[in-house]
Amino acid sequence: MKALYITSIEPFSGKTAVCLALGRRFKREGYEVGYFKPLSTQPWEPVPGRALDEDADFIRRTLDLPESTEELIGILLTPSLAREMRCGCTDRDLMSEVQAAYEKIQDKDIVLIEGGGSLREGVSLGLDPKSVTETLDVQALAIVRYHNRVNQGDDCITAYRQLYDQLIGTMINAVPRREQKLSEKICTPCLEKQGIRVLGTIPFQEELQAISVDELAEVLNAEFLTLPEKGDVLIERLIVGAMGVDQALPRIRRIAGAKALITGGDRSDMQLVGLEAATRCLILTGNLRPMPEVLRRAEEFGVPVLLVRQNTLETVEAIEAVFGKTRLGQESKLQRFEDLFAENFDLERLYDLMGLS
């Protein structure tokens, strides 16, 4: 059995996406694939009384794994466990529990282990990436999210110093296209000279930051006024319709990509302009229902309309808090990431390092 622990320097760097891309590829090549998450810090209750990890459940379903979601998680950090650990009211050996859970899923060819969202996550529990990789004796891939030319080097070196012998390599994710050649031709060789393997430099792709209408509705607790079946439509741009109608039409048309227009429910003039300008979704604020003509035209154009209770500012803030941080829940997004990953990640080198070839 081979195992690969996938961690990152900061949250929302692409760990789950890499687990899925590798998992689906390994399965296509005939390997029996397993998945394990030693520590989940964000319990999710799909039904009352049943706490799970949402990412683990998503991967279980996507990779069609036979285990229950509970079996894929070592420790689920519930509020009660967090309180017990803080006050020293428990004598549980969490690492032993992680080891026991991990042993139960080792009857695979390859196990992908989704680690912490940072190198310090779980340190107070003794379940940080360094401790887990050493205890389970597994190799680690560290994902660095690109911010600037300096941070990619700093973060790769930090991962190397923290994980050292366990580090199989690093991957730099979401690199702007204009920076990719410099990253590959200058930064990567510099890191390699220091003994830090850079296995991939994945370009930034705007489509992967998109959010679906269903996800918008969930975040905003919105009501569908039209076309709930269009919930899988992806939105790449947000436009706030606070300007005058005369300025709105040319401005909205100039903005590329799939757009959602956020405007007051009483702004029927702006709503109709948005529909004419090929927006993909209308988000109406203030819990004010639009005129019937707006809903009729939205149906004609195939545009879902969401009604939210919040005002426009609150709505924008709520969406911005999650924009670019949603999982690859749509097959089109997942397939696009897989393509980028295959084109820009040295899979042959990874296979050699893992002893798969």
Language model segments and positions:
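Non-catalytic interface/targeting segments
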Residues: T201-T263, E320-S357
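Phosphate-binding/switch loop-helix module in NTP-utilizing enzymes
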Residues: A82-L125, K130-T135
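Conserved catalytic-core segment of NTP-binding enzymes
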Residues: G116-I196, D266-L328
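N-terminal phosphate/diphosphate-binding loop that engages ATP/GTP or pyrophosphate donors
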Residues: A3-S13, A17-R92, E97, A101-Y102, ...
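Flexible, charged surface loops at secondary-structure boundaries
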Residues: K104-D107, P250-K259, G274-A278
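Fold-independent oxyanion-binding glycine-rich loops
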Residues: S8-I9, P38-L39, L72, E114-G117, ...
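Ligand-binding beta-strand-loop-alpha-helix segment within the catalytic cores
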Residues: G74-P79, C89-R92, P189-Q209
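Structural motif
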Residues: A3-L4, E32-G34, D57, D109-V111, ...
